[in-house]
Amino acid sequence: MKPMLKDFSNLLLVVLCDYVLGEAEYLLLQEPVHVALSDRTVSVGFHYLSDVNGTLRNVSVMLWEANTNRTLTTKYLLTNQAQGTLQFECFYFKEAGDYWFVMIPEVTDNGTQVPLWEKSAFLKVEWPVFHIDLNRTAKAAEGTFQVGVFTTQPLCLFPVDKPDMLVDVIFTDRLPEARASLGQPLEIRASKRTKLTQGQWVEFGCAPVGVEAYVTVMLRLLGQDSVIASTGPIDLAQKFGYKLMMAPEVTCESVLEVMVLPPPCVFVQGVLAVYKEAPKRPEERTFQVAENRLPLGERRTVFNCTLFDVGKNKYCFNFGIVKKGHFSAKECMLIQRNIETWGPWQPWSPCSTTCGDAVRERRRLCVTSFPSRPSCSGMSSETSPCSLEECAVFRPPGPSPVSPQDPVKSNNVVTVTGISLCLFIIFATVLITLWRRFGRAPKCSTPVRHNSIHSPGFRKNSDEENICELSEPRGSFSDAGDGPRGSPGDTGIPLTYRCSASAPPEDEASGSESFQSNAQKIIPPLFSYRLAQQQLKEMKKKGLTETTKVYHVSQSPLTDTVVDATASPPLDLECPEEAAASKFRIKSPFLDQPGAGTGERPPSRLDGIVPPPGCAVSPSQTLIQKSQIRSTGGRDGSSERCHSRSSLFRRTASFHETKQSRPFRERSLSALTPRQVPAYSSRMRTWDQMEDRCRPPSRSTHLLPERPEHFQGAGRTSSPLGPLSKSYTVGHPRRKPDPGDRQAGLVAGAEKMEPHRAHRGPSPSHRSASRKQSSPIFLKDSYQKVSQLSPSHFRKDKCQSFPIHPEFAFYDNTSFRLTEAEQRMLDLPGYFGSNEEDETTSTLSVEKLVI
């Protein structure tokens, strides 16, 4: 066995040596695969052995294309070159296919070449990779599109016969799988020749395929059937899709236009719907605002602006193809809607002329959200002719017709004249009023008393008259006087409750004679005088010599009425404030002269002061004032105030200012009540000594007494009375002042008054003796005859009952003449009584009217 293996090994070694050392011929390709049209060359390696004699023969390498069965080129080897590499350029490889490299040796005997197929090389050539794309053109409305051809392979630079490319496009209306069921498909081909480049866009026009269009693109070399690259079929609707042409934000004025941009080569046919912005929460449901259908080939549609809400809101538009039933386009936008519309027409204006051809005009306003820049479309005004009467053909000769402005001018003149006349009347009225108020010197001053009930507006009472001389201004018959000032609290205090500021405490001793020294002659108002005359006549008819009447007193003294006789509630002798006084009081027509100081007043004491020289009046109006001055310890020592009473009061002053609960007064013709006796201070003077006429009272005259010695008496006390004291100061009686001392007594000051009498005497003459007596507890009331003269003698005095000036002619001295019996009956002085035993009841004061 071993010898057999040894022999076989030797045989293999001989064969191997023969192969290695023997002759070998071959062709070798570096790259078996090549890219057509590329810029790379093909390299082929060869090895060829010479013959036995060592001579070289001619050898060539042939490039043969198998697809076309033709030789493309042949290259020869050098004679003395047994091995090497041959280069084949890129332009030999224009198409993809199979290529062969074959070595062909030369035969020596006859010179023919026989290819050695056993000694050949195979080359595979492929097409380069081209990318095809479709795109919209700038003229999308024209129905065109673009085909792009791109490759990343570097192409060969053909020196001659550079090949061209051919781009073929095939349009169809359906996909290949649907052709059998729907019949013969519609195909439209379009080709374009182009140069061989690495990338380019080739534009094609659209074929009228329909709503659906499919495109297939193929790339070939010109003149060849082989396809370099192809793509398709491509659904253009899916490739490009539908687009809605609209701005992101638009202001809707009248209508909103929306344009649908379809894919290239596709006709529009579908539904365009409008939805409000999608809700933010999923549970909310969107609602459709409107929907418009687009017919075949129509790309534009409009929506009315009234469909959208006022303001800025977001809406979405969806377009869908009818066949597919789904929306393939959606766009959202902000729509601003403003209110811009025309308002109603205004009425027609009047015709421009009164005759002939005329026109009229009417206007309307633009209602808009932006009044500063209204943009309503249309005319804001319009005109129309007016059909009026024909104008007169023949006109009378004369001046030119008046222009339409002349009536307006005449109307203006009338208006200006009327206004001027009205202004003149107003101006004249103002001047007359000012002249009446400031142009004349006032006959009498008009002092007022604050908080007056009968004159709340500080006016002169209706029943007051001026009794002063023409050359001397006097104070008005008001409720307040111009006398000396008292304390600030004295203003507004009733007349009968004002304390004397000039009387010292020791003057209480002279209270017994204060009855005669405090008489006052006054003139009654007209209504009171006539009322007295009427009462006297009634008494005469009834045969009465004495009677009592109670009158209801209103704020207007002219409306006093008679009521049944009644008892009056007691007076408040604690000096109440004016605000608590009764509104049914009657105010004095003369000036009140409050005292210079205040003091404390015991209850059931009445105060008064001596009056200054006043107007001379008739003795028929003389009233007897019974007064008594209380002692004062200091001006600010007590919280309760007593106020001095002025001597210049009217005859109705006996109706005291009382509380509001006393709306009635009692009036008597023969007797007086005991508690409300006002202190009159002017009776002490006689008519014989009053030769001078009345003079205006001076404020400075009554401020301080001229003769202080008259206020000093034997019974002077050193301590003042307390505010709640019930005791009375004991005074000594004074003598009755004679007529010579009367003037000094008037200026001296106030005298103290005695307390009220406990009973009434038959006459003032009988009471005068008892009044001069004094008591350790209180002074006895007494009366004294006031005057030595009879009323007839007083009437003869030159100072009449009424002023003789023509201004006072209304007071007729002869209108109130009485009979002799009435004269004798009424020739009694008034007197005041007092009843201190009954402190709870009292009647309103009454007065005696002496004619």
Swiss-Prot record:
Intervals, Extracellular compartment: 25-412
Reported consequences of knocking out the gene: Some animals develop hydrocephalus as early as 8 weeks after birth. A few die spontaneously at 9 weeks and have diffuse cerebral hemorrhage not seen in wild-type littermates.
Residue span of region Disordered: 471-516, 626-646, 682-777
Positions annotated as glycosylated: N53, N58, N69, N110, N135, N304
Membrane-spanning intervals of the chain: 413-433
Annotated disulfide bonds: C351-C386, C355-C391, C366-C376
Subcellular location: Endosome membrane; Cell junction, Focal adhesion
Classification via InterPro entries: THSD1, THSD1_D2, THSD1_D3, THSD1_N, TSP1_rpt, TSP1_rpt_sf
This protein's GO CC annotations: cell periphery; cell surface; cytoplasm; endosome; endosome membrane; focal adhesion
Name of protein: Thrombospondin type-1 domain-containing protein 1
Organism: Mus musculus (Mouse)
Gene: Thsd1
